[in-house]
From Swiss-Prot:
Protein name, per record: Bifunctional trehalose-6-phosphate synthase/phosphatase
UniProt-annotated stretches for the region Alpha,alpha-trehalose-phosphate synthase: 1-464
Amino-acid positions noted as binding alpha,alpha-trehalose 6-phosphate in the UniProt annotation, renumbered to this chain: 503-505
Biological pathway: Glycan biosynthesis; trehalose biosynthesis
Free-text function comment from the UniProt entry: Bifunctional enzyme which catalyzes the transfer of glucose from UDP-alpha-D-glucose to glucose-6-phosphate to form trehalose-6-phosphate (Tre6P) and removes the phosphate from Tre6P to produce free trehalose.
Positions with a binding annotation for Mg(2+): 503, 505, 684
Active site, per annotation: 503
InterPro entries: Glyco_trans_20 (IPR001830), HAD-like_sf (IPR036412), HAD-SF_hydro_IIB (IPR006379), HAD_sf (IPR023214), Trehalose_OtsA (IPR012766), Trehalose_PPase (IPR003337)
Source organism of the structure: Thermoproteus tenax (strain ATCC 35583 / DSM 2078 / JCM 9277 / NBRC 100435 / Kra 1)
GO molecular function: alpha,alpha-trehalose-phosphate synthase (UDP-forming) activity; metal ion binding; trehalose-phosphatase activity
One GO CC term on file: cytosol
Start and end residues of each stretch annotated as Trehalose-6-phosphate phosphatase: 465-731
One annotated GO biological process: trehalose biosynthetic process
Keywords: Carbohydrate metabolism, Glycosyltransferase, Hydrolase, Magnesium, Metal-binding, Multifunctional enzyme, Transferase
Length: 731
């Protein structure tokens, strides 16, 4: 098994003369540290690691010699022309996705030509992966540039596919700004993965909510049901090479840089920040907060200095050029108004700084001022904390950075609150050394445990697990397709204790326009009676119907009944018992929301049950209803959050009911109670998937009709299911 890493850029930089050098920072550094710690992946069972990406040289200038030298290093270049780079990278990736995913929708552009370029380049990357891949390999695709690639690879190669997003995933309301076709393809593209990873639970929840809202897929227990597959969604906060930064003050090259900086900055307290030039980083607000601090705390003038490092990015792009001019202007104004002959408030560097200088700044800085307006993680915050071997220093961190979820001991601020940030600077500079040490040590312990090696290892192991689970399902599906009715009859006849769990609507009878019309015919009543009369054979009808309906039509048969999706249970010949307690407090509120939707969707109606309330839309226009379903589920989810209720989406129905009671929980209880050695389960919609999930591996699970399922076997409709059951009953 090999690992194929896929990213926009290969982890190298090509000089004008064709020299190949390792890239510094970002994914390249993270993967180098991770793979170095696990012996190139061999400790994880990986035979080889291959990296697929663009070399950074336009294809019209990329020589065959360069491509061969890259391949000799385990790097597979994807050729991109200047035109493709412009449309794919500068266009859709950085002018549409980057601003939108960071919450700056006003900066996003929506150009058809950019979307076409994005699709075309994603296809190129996917084809390069497929050409390299061998059955059983793992493919790890990185970041927003390549969100369509997982689905393309999934269709063409027998591999495990993982995707990791390094930036925030936006709320559904922001994603909705994308044209619907683009939005759908992006979500479906990501769902081609076996595993989709994010930095934080917030981003993971945003993704899952978008999938439910825009695609209608079901999300349950950290996975999304896509056909017979379960796409796992996980949280994997990226870490750093902790020891490298913790021990940096012992590195001679860093020590030398520390001495130079101390000589230059004198005895002043050092507040420090470093960012790539970008509107998401909040540099101008940070500068404003520093000015506010100096004006409100003049005693710190001459005693503290702000070292502001801005690394050039997207040079030549008008917006970025204007941003730089604004920063230059503000820094110059503040230094001119507040500076002295022997002191400047802001030491401003607009350039790339080498690693020893950066580590020296981490070590000498008293305060790190990390205040992005939005950031997927922010490793600078982690690197600063890790570098504090002497246990002295204070981190001021934006609550809008993913790192704030892990670094709770930082002074967490809102970057839009200039006054609050100024006060945090004052607090940081005045904090006692004991308090600094308490906070730093707590954060360091967390960073040491959650380092970059754990990030990579957790993701790879989770991907292997997700891949194995999918392969088991596929294997079971292939196997069951070959089973004959004769084997079913043989297993049924040989069994000592049998259990049949049968859904009602759509499974034993057809779906009707209105629930009261779906009464059982004489043939069905006779079939159920004969099956239930067999020795050691328990037949249960497991339905979303209420007790009154099931009792009225099936109560005289020797069968068990489960009503309202597992909330009520009646054993053959027994009395009804409630498996939960009905709380009426929420019902009127939920009913009101459903009735609002029913009034807007002709042909739909609300059904009030004992435990739940259902909105049926079988008779409504499908186009109108399907759109309304997503909006209804969204409205109910928000309105009933934290209420202990669940929202079930069945076939042409949405139901609100108490959580924890499903067909699956009822089936599990019956399986545990009866201990059968033959199990037959049949159902036709999403609410029946819970029964399929808890059924033992030896069970015959039957999906009635089309659609994604966990069942191992399928029949066309209720008639096919009845025909199958007829094979089991005695003559």
């Amino acid at each position: 098994m090999r690992l194929i890493v896929v990213s926009n850029r290969l982890p190298v930089t090509i000089s004008p003369s064709g020299e190949i050098r390792e890239s510094v920072g970002g994914l390249a550094t993270a993967m180098k540290s991770f793979l170095g710690a696990v012996n190139g992946g061999r400790e994880l069972g990986l035979e080889e690691v291959v990296w697929v990406g663009w070399s950074g040289v336009p294809s019209e200038r990329e020589s065959n010699d360069l491509r061969e030298r890259l391949r000799g290093m385990g790097l597979e270049p994807v050729p991109l022309s200047s035109e493709e780079v412009e449309g794919f990278y500068e266009g859709f990736s950085n002018s549409t996705l980057w601003p939108l995913f960071h919450g700056f929708s006003e900066y996003a552009t929506y150009e058809e030509k950019h979307w076409r370029a994005y699709r075309g380049v994603n296809e190129k990357y996917a084809k390069a992966v497929v050409a390299l891949a061998r059955p059983g390999d793992l493919v790890w695709i990185h970041d927003y540039h390549l969100m369509l690639a997982p689905a393309i690879v999934r269709e063409a190669a027998e591999v495990g596919v993982g995707f990791f997003l390094h930036i925030p995933f936006p709320p559904a309301e922001l994603l909705q700004l994308l044209p619907s076709e683009w939005r759908r393809e992006i979500l479906e593209g990501l769902l081609g993965s076996d595993l989709v990873g994010f930095h934080t639970y917030e981003y993971s929840a945003n993704f899952s909510r978008s999938v439910v809202r825009f695609l209608g897929y079901k999300v349950e227990m950290g996975a999304i049901a896509v056909g017979h597959r379960r796409v796992r969604v996980g949280v994997f906060p990226i870490g750093i090479d902790f020891d490298r930064f913790y021990n940096s003050s012992q590195d001679p090259s860093v020590v030398e840089e520390m001495a130079k900086l101390r000589e230059m900055l004198g005895r002043a307290k050092v507040v420090f920040s470093i960012d790539r030039l970008d509107y998401t980083k909040g540099v101008l607000r940070r500068v404003a907060a520093w000015e506010r601090f100096l004006r409100e705390h003049p005693e710190w003038r001459g005693r503290a200095v702000f070292v502001l490092v801005v690394v050039p990015s997207r040079t030549g792009v008008p917006m970025y050029e204007e941003m730089k001019r604004q920063i230059d202007r503000e820094v110059g104004r503040i230094n001119g108004e507040l500076g002295e002959l022997n002191w400047v408030p802001i030491v401003y560097l607009y350039r790339f700084i080498p690693s020893p200088t950066l580590m020296a700044l981490y070590n000498i800085a008293d305060v790190a001022l990390i205040t992005p307006l939005r950031d997927g993680m922010n490793l600078v915050a982690k690197e600063f904390v890790a570098s504090k071997r002497d246990c002295r220093g204070v981190l001021i961190l934006s609550e809008l950075a993913g790192a704030s979820k892990e670094l709770a001991e930082a002074l967490v601020i809102n970057p839009n609150d200039v006054g609050g940030t100024a006060e945090a600077i004052a607090e940081a500079l005045s904090m006692s050394e004991d308090e600094q040490c308490r906070r730093i040590r707590a954060m360091q312990e967390r960073l040491r445990m959650r380092d970059v090696v754990r990030w990579g290892t957790d993701f790879i192991y989770s991907l292997i697990s997700a891949k194995s689970a999918r392969e088991e399902v596929e294997k079971a599906l292939r196997y069951m397709e070959e089973l004959s009715v004769d084997k079913l009859k043989s297993d049924f006849a040989k069994a000592k204790r049998r259990l049949l769990l049968l859904d009602y609507d759509g499974t034993l009878v057809p779906h009707y326009p209105y629930p009261h019309m779906a009464v059982p015919d004489g043939d069905l009543l006779e079939l159920l009676s004969r099956l239930a009369a067999l020795p050691e054979t328990a037949v249960y009808v497991v339905s979303g119907r209420g007790r009154d309906f099931l009792d009225g039509w099936l109560g005289r048969l020797p069968v068990g009944l489960v009503a309202e999706h597992g909330f009520f249970l009646k054993h053959p010949g027994g009395e009804w018992k409630s498996l939960g307690k009905v709380d009426p407090s929420w019902r009127q509120y939920a009913k009101g929301i459903m009735e609002d939707f029913a009034s807007n969707v002709p042909g739909s109606f609300v059904e009030v049950k004992e435990a739940g309330i259902a909105w049926h839309y079988r008779n409504a226009d499908e186009t109108i209803a399907e759109k309304a379903v997503v909006e209804l589920i969204d409205a109910l989810s928000n309105a009933l959050a934290g209420s202990g209720l669940s929202i079930l989406r069945g076939k042409k129905v949405v139901e609100v009911r108490p959580a924890g009671y499903t067909k699956g929980t009822a089936a599990k209880m019956l399986l545990d109670e009866l201990s059968p050695d033959f199990v037959f389960v049949a159902g036709d919609d999403e609410t029946d998937e819970g029964m399929f999930e808890v059924a033992p591996q030896s069970a015959y699970t039957v999906k009635v009709g089309p659609g994604p399922t966990l069942a191992k076997f399928r029949v066309g409709d209720y008639r096919g299911l009845r025909s199958l059951l007829e094979q089991l009953r005695p003559p």
